[in-house]
């Protein structure tokens, strides 16, 4: 199962880009031994359409091109679930992998958010809470959660779980 983070907008050089790259590299390295041959970070250009709904629709069409037939779409959106813990997410990732799904595509919208068509197609919609976060940090956090899911599946000590 390929892992793909597809986000609208470009991360500028700086600490967020470096940290996102670090988590992507870690996930790619660890994932190879767990049935995840690659982890890609794809940047979709922001639409230049005049109206926000048109921008969202254009960006959704571009994001959808990265979802292969049978792939899993997970969206980060302000209306998403903030109550799914890392271990539960890891279980879902493992289930999708074990069902021989070809790819897990995690999407992050642009400044106007995600189009309803992406939210409708998504098998899981997540949120990092009610607070508004900078786009670059959301990307870092999404990649960190992918990496954390893989460490949980590998039994790696990075994730220590809940205190018993």
UniProtKB/Swiss-Prot annotation:
Pfam families xrefs: SPOUT_MTase (PF02590)
Enzyme class: transferase
GO cellular component terms attached to this protein's record: cytoplasm
Origin: domain of life: Bacteria
Binding site for S-adenosyl-L-methionine: 109
Gene: rlmH
UniProt cross-references to NCBIfam families, sorted A to Z: PRK00103.2-3 (NF000989), PRK00103.2-5 (NF000991)
Protein name as catalogued: Ribosomal RNA large subunit methyltransferase H
InterPro entries: Alpha/beta_knot_MTases, RlmH-like, tRNA_m1G_MTases_N
EC number: 2.1.1.177
KW Repeat (keyword) present: no
Lineage: Bacteria, Pseudomonadati, Pseudomonadota, Alphaproteobacteria, Hyphomicrobiales
Localization, UniProt: Cytoplasm
Subunit structure: Homodimer.
Record-stated family: Belongs to the RNA methyltransferase RlmH family.
UniProt keywords, alphabetically: Cytoplasm, Methyltransferase, rRNA processing, S-adenosyl-L-methionine, Transferase
Species of origin: Methylobacterium radiotolerans (strain ATCC 27329 / DSM 1819 / JCM 2831 / NBRC 15690 / NCIMB 10815 / 0-1)
GO molecular function annotations of the record: rRNA (pseudouridine-N3-)-methyltransferase activity
Chief place where the protein resides: cytoplasm
Entry keyword annotation includes rRNA processing: yes
Catalytic activity: pseudouridine(1915) in 23S rRNA + S-adenosyl-L-methionine = N(3)-methylpseudouridine(1915) in 23S rRNA + S-adenosyl-L-homocysteine + H(+)
Function: Specifically methylates the pseudouridine at position 1915 (m3Psi1915) in 23S rRNA.
């Amino acid at each position: 199962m390929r892992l793909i983070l597809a986000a609208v907008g470009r991360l500028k050089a700086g600490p967020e880009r470096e940290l996102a790259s670090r988590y992507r590299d870690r996930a790619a390295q660890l994932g190879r031994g767990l049935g995840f041959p690659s982890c890609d970070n794809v940047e979709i250009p922001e639409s230049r359409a005049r109206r926000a709904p048109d921008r969202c629709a254009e960006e959704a069409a571009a994001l959808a091109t990265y979802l292969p037939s049978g792939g899993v779409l997970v969206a980060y959106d302000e209306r998403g679930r903030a109550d799914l813990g890392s271990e539960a997410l890891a279980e879902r990732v493992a289930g999708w992998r074990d069902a021989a799904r070809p790819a897990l595509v995690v999407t992050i919208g642009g400044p106007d958010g995600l189009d309803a068509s992406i939210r409708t197609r998504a098998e899981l919609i997540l949120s990092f809470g009610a607070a508004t976060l900078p786009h670059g940090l959301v990307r870092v956090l999404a990649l960190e959660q992918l990496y954390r899911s893989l460490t949980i599946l590998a039994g790696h000590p990075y994730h220590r779980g809940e205190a018993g």
